[in-house]
């Protein structure tokens, strides 16, 4: 990748719009689930999987099953995304409510 394309890629990354939403990580082997929220739910899996592969994930409850069953037994699901024009002041509270709702539905742990 030449210098100009790299600069363009970095600029595009910095200018992308947030995608606020709720996601789940599910272990196929045990049926365990973890639910979290993100301001970039569309790219959240990359960061999670990176930390889990290295063994440096801040989520110990997720790291242990990952180590026991391996990456192939896990899946990432985007459960819900807030619309782009959702009011900024109530966004955090709404994400917490929706996370709690999905945790109850899936009988999941918090991320």
Predicted regions and their residues:
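Structure-specific nucleic-acid interaction/processing domains
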Residues: 2-111
């Amino acid at each position: 990748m030449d210098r100009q394309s790299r600069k363009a890629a970095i600029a595009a990354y910095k200018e992308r719009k947030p995608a606020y939403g709720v996601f789940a990580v599910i272990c196929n082997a045990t049926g365990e689930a973890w639910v979290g929220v993100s301001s970039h739910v569309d790219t959240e899996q990359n960061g999670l999987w990176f930390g889990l592969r290295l063994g440096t994930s801040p989520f110990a409850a997720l790291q242990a099953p990952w180590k026991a069953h391996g990456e192939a037994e896990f899946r990432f699901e985007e459960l819900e995304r807030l619309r782009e024009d959702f009011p900024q002041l109530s966004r955090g509270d709404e994400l917490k409510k929706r996370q709690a709702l999905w945790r109850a539905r899936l009988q999941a742990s918090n991320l």
